[in-house]
Amino acid sequence: MRKFFVCVNLLLLLLTQTACTAESDCDIPRQEPLSASSSFHLLESVGAVWDSSPPTSGPHYPIAPAGGIYDFTLSSLEQVAFLESGGVIVQYHPNRIENNLGKLTLLANNNVIVSPNPTLDIPVIGTAWTWKISCKNFDTTALRGFITDYVGKAEANHRK
């Protein structure tokens, strides 16, 4: 009987170790500090600085771009304006997404921008107001979850 419990405990330990080390395509969404310059509405980016790249808050245009699919990289002023309006941006490195561009574009709508960004260190990044998720591979489930969790939530995080 004692051998049985030892075997069960070893099996549980092995399963726990396997589950804890399993690789996921996206990291856990992380909140970034609200930039002190987030209340600045600018008409040009001269002298503007953002705390991260791609940004999750900071100076921005007074009017946000429309949601949808873009074939160019949005400026940081455009990105932050869209995030402040409650939108989510999914950016991808055009040389690192393999055959997933069609799937990525399915995420786009009035509240979600999908845009290339060749300066990314990793294949896909999702941003929302003060939130970011990084993905080493395209992961529909993780990105849809991020969009669901953060689209429309900018105001709740704006004054923290």
Name every feature range the model reports, one short phrase each.
Residues 68-107:
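Mid-length scaffold segments of soluble, non-membrane domains
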Residues 15-19:
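C-terminal motif of bacterial Sec signal peptides marking the signal peptidase cleavage site
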Residues 21, 25-27, 134-136:
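Sequence contexts marking disulfide-bonded cysteines in secreted/extracellular proteins
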Residues 35, 43, 83, 107, ...:
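A generic structural signal for short, non-catalytic loop/turn and secondary-structure boundary residues
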Residues 24-79:
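Surface-exposed, low-hydrophobicity interaction/linker segments
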Residues 103, 108-160:
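Helix-rich interaction surfaces within compact, conserved domain-sized segments
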Residues 1-8:
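Bacterial N-terminal signal peptides that target proteins for export
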